[in-house]
Amino acid sequence: ATAKKDVTVTSKKNDNVPAATDNLPVNSYTALNYNEVKGVWIWYSELYPILTGKSESQLRSGIGEYYDNCLSLGINTVYVHVRPFGDAIYKSDYFPWSKYCTGYIGKDPGYDPLKVMIDEAHARGISFQAWVNPLRCYYEDDAPDVSTTYKTGQWYDTKDGDYIVKVKSYWWLNPAYKEVTDLIANGAAELVSKYDVDGVHIDDYFYPTTEAYFDSIAFNASSYSSLSQFRLDNCSRMIADMYKAVKSHNPTALFGVSAQGNVTNNETQLYADVEKWSKEDGYVDYMAPQIYYGFDNGG
């Protein structure tokens, strides 16, 4: 039988990662969310022309135009990419400045792009959801530039394929470790605690591969006999930790997942137990499946 204990592998490193969501205050802001959501994603490539190397006033003008276009289409909610690659378009204690701010990873743009985008959204009555990719980290060429001030920089520096693992051209965090999922939860808590975001949102990037090499060290150190169940439980723990982090720091903010539209693929290819998250309390406020196909598709 598959063992269902010891989901979190004991670290063999002295990383001194703080307990999840330590020392972050509760935000008294009342989140702006709608019963009927009409929303759009604004991903990092769409931020590039209005953010990268731009001044605060230029960003304010550019994002304002985006939002005005949204309003003209009846859109009341935006899901804005604030952490696409283990980085941040805001001042973070856990992740370096995104290269999409200045063109260089770790470089402070001299103002707070996230606050600008939130303020402009709220001025128009638009709900602002902070969209993060929790596991996807840096492109291979950017990774050496990440300061070891940050845990992801420290973990990359070890190059051991354990906490952070290279898959094709990108480095990915391994959610088998509590230190890793604590970092992810801290990142969610930081957004909700320090900013008047209306929610935290993630998409369909979970495990990047079905190959066993990705987490073989952690799996072999666990009591699991099934790699699939090991990964499903790791993802579920990460989602539960993020949900708790959001709700602990602003109970009115939402936490949701936009997973793939095919339940089987989610569970067998990405190890995202979307059925569990949808049915049980403590995981998500909503699911927004990515249904990019017609009724004739069997997915």
Task: Please identify what each model-predicted range represents.
Residues 35, 46, 86-113, 142-174, ...:
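Aromatic- and acidic-residue-enriched carbohydrate-binding clefts of CAZyme catalytic domains
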Residues 43-47, 83-85, 133-135, 202-207, ...:
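Active-site beta-loop-alpha junctions enriched in small/polar residues
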Residues 38-42, 78-80, 128-130, 200-202, ...:
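Hydrophobic faces of well-ordered beta-strands that scaffold small-molecule active sites
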Residues 30-59, 129-130, 135-190, 194:
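Active-site-adjacent "subsite" loops/lids of carbohydrate-active enzymes
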Residues 56-57, 83-88, 107-108, 261-270, ...:
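Acidic-and-aromatic substrate-binding clefts and catalytic sites of carbohydrate-active enzymes
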Residues 76, 152-276, 280, 292-293:
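Polysaccharide-binding and catalytic clefts of secreted carbohydrate-active enzymes
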Residues 66, 84-133, 227-249:
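Aromatic-lined substrate-binding rim segments of carbohydrate-active enzymes
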Residues 61-87, 195-197:
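Catalytic domains of carbohydrate-active enzymes, especially glycoside hydrolases
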